[in-house]
Amino acid sequence: MGPDEASTLMQNSRAPISAPAKEPIPGEVPRHAVFLPDPSLHHIVIIGGGAAGLELATKLGNSLGRRRKVQITLVERARTHIWKPHLHEVAAGTLDVGRDAIDYLAHASEHHFRYRIGEMIGLDRSRRQVHLGRTYDAEGEEITPARSISYDTLVIAIGSTSNDFGTPGAQEFAISLDTADQAVRFHQRLVNRFIRAHAQAGPVRLGQLHVTIIGAGATGTELAAELHRTTRQLVAYGLDRIDPEEDLKITLVEAADRILPAVPLRVAEGATRLLEGLGIDVRSKSRVVEVRKDGVQLSDGEFIPSELVVWSAGVRGPDVVRNLDGLEASTSNQLVIQPTLQTTKDPDIFAIGDCAYLVSPGETRPIPPRAQAASQQSSHLHKQMKRRLNGVALQPFVYRDFGSLVSLGKYTTVGNLMGAVKGKGLMVEGYFARFMYESLYKMHQMALFGLWKVLLLSMARSLTSRHEARVKLH
């Protein structure tokens, strides 16, 4: 960062809090109904209820909303929150959304912020208004109209989506695991395919119970291992006309020269050996050029017959990033931000989590889109928001990489924990790695509920889990 950029950054972070957002021009017919907050309170609007957005809303509500220092509004299109690293378990059926989801409306009421259902479709920076699109129910009936929300400080935390790179057929015939709804939809299709194969008169045909997972990052690799376990559990439940060794096939396809390209080589090699030992077909250096209704076409001409295809490759920001009134975006469609987490074009707008693009000073690569980065940015911005309200210069965010952990279902957990010395890491696996992996979710829960409630939830979970099915059938 040059001297001029640093000077601008410090001026922006010391800038006084902006005046209340502009009201509609008298006589003008607005395109949206406009929600105007209490003018006596600074209004913080958070778009997106993922890990970063919900943790920030909860912390701000507990510290500032409780004392009526600010007004906080969280906007999210979903009704409930599921920790995104758990979506592969939802897809496999080993995690029950109905039991583990957090209801936004109830959580907001308990933690002194407001929840508004909606999805951002645009932004007017001059009036400081976020435009929300209409929402509909499953029958196509309108739930909420198009409207706008005025803000004094805007935090964009809309996460990321998988990137199909324009591959023909990917959107039509592959399922992504970006949301809980998508994960539930995949699980329902999986169970239905098993029931159909069990009930049919003839034998299982080629490709009928084949699942191809495109992208062998953490999500794809974890899903492959989890599916191996749950598909055999479905057979054990009574769908015994299916032979899990002969009829079931899981193929994991990765364009890079190995799976888990973001983790150390030895961790990836260990995961590959385990997956192949389970009978999972691991294909590295394999590029998908087309997804069809009945399978996947590779660049080398091979066709993989598949009844279900999951696309978990690539990461990019949501399409709406390109429609945010001139905010700077990266080639991966993420919002470019400064070390203070402010966007480069507007000091009143922040971005955190997967949708944010930040290259830390002294680094050459951006902060990776991981849950630990989202949580760290949420905690940092919570502290900085108090400084902002008091007109004090904002401090830069410093990312700490604690390593990567990959859960391979009940079989094992592997990973690399970063030490105090940069670049040095400790490879872990087995029970200790599993404990560390589960601790990541406990930390997310503690950010939302506090230590004592998490302890009570854990105790209740251990008492009820023995009476529940290992795999959901609905």
PLM region descriptions:
Residues 2, 6-41, 113-210, 310:
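FAD-binding core/adjacent interface of flavoenzyme oxidoreductases
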Residues 2, 10-122, 218-263, 310:
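Beta1-alpha1 glycine-rich phosphate/pyrophosphate-binding loop at the start
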Residues 6-31, 39, 383-474:
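C-terminal, flexible cofactor-proximal segment of oxidoreductases
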Residues 22-32, 172-201, 294-297, 303-308, ...:
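FAD-site-proximal beta/loop scaffold in flavoenzymes
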Residues 47-48, 156, 214:
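Conserved N-terminal Rossmann-fold NAD(P)-binding element of oxidoreductases
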Residues 69-71, 111, 115-134, 228-339, ...:
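A Rossmann-like FAD-binding core segment of flavoenzymes
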Residues 72, 370-389, 405:
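An active-site-proximal "capping" alpha-helix that borders the catalytic cofactor pocket
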